[in-house]
């Protein structure tokens, strides 16, 4: 049972320098960077550390996920951010749960025993609201429908046919899993503060994308 970990980056030299030396290559069959056009030395640092890099032509997290999965083969795929928000030690925990028979496992930043050191009150409220909407309208059972740190069976990922280009791919994945009544196993964890770099999340822009997506998925996607 093989797993590829996709490390999604765009100008994350500070985080990559601190986080990636903590990631053990024996945790997964492959660990591959998908880079959206970094100009701060992220790509060079990744190669220096011995990682393969796929160059992303179009920007956006959703696009990066599909670029990576389309270019590779494995039984499971995992998406990881090296900006400091994702704990490296959670990588083997996610993989272990797939060995126990779970098709989808993700990290929750807002479960009962979770801690987010990075989210401000606007982000907390937004996460609660959109997670509530996903659970209410699509039958989900999530405590965090907006986190992208997850492992998913490749066959299932392909069946979801995601088309969201940006951060909204995280919510779209949860919605489409819920509509198919496929359970996600959540691991409660800690979200540390970001390490350097620029925050990619713009609350108003992302909020508008997520709202439109809920309407679109509710009306059109079966």
Question: Where in this protein do the model-derived segments appear?
Answer:
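Short, well-formed alpha-helical segments that are part of the catalytic scaffolds
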Residues: 9-25
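Short beta-strand/loop segment that forms part of the nucleotide-sugar
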Residues: 20, 28-37
């Amino acid at each position: 049972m093989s797993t590829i970990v996709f490390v999604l980056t765009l100008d994350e030299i500070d985080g990559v320098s601190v986080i990636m030396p903590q990631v053990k290559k024996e945790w997964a069959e492959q660990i591959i960077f998908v880079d959206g056009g970094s100009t701060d030395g992220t790509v060079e640092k990744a190669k220096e550390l011995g990682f393969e890099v796929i160059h992303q032509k179009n920007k956006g997290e959703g696009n990066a996920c599909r670029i990576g999965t389309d270019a590779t083969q494995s039984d499971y795929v995992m998406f990881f951010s090296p900006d400091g928000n994702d704990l490296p030690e959670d990588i083997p925990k996610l993989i272990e749960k797939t060995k126990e028979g779970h098709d989808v496992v993700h990290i929750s930043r807002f479960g009962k025993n979770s801690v987010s050191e990075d989210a401000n009150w606007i982000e907390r409220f937004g996460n609660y609201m959109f997670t509530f909407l996903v659970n209410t309208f699509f039958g989900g059972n999530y405590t965090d429908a907006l986190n992208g740190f997850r492992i998913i069976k490749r066959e299932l990922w392909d069946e979801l046919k995601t088309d969201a280009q940006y951060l909204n791919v995280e919510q779209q994945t949860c919605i489409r899993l819920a509509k198919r009544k496929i359970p996600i196993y959540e691991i409660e964890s800690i979200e540390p503060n970001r390490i350097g770099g620029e925050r990619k999340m713009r609350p108003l822009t992302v909020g508008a994308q997520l709202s439109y997506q809920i309407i679109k998925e509710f009306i059109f996607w079966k």
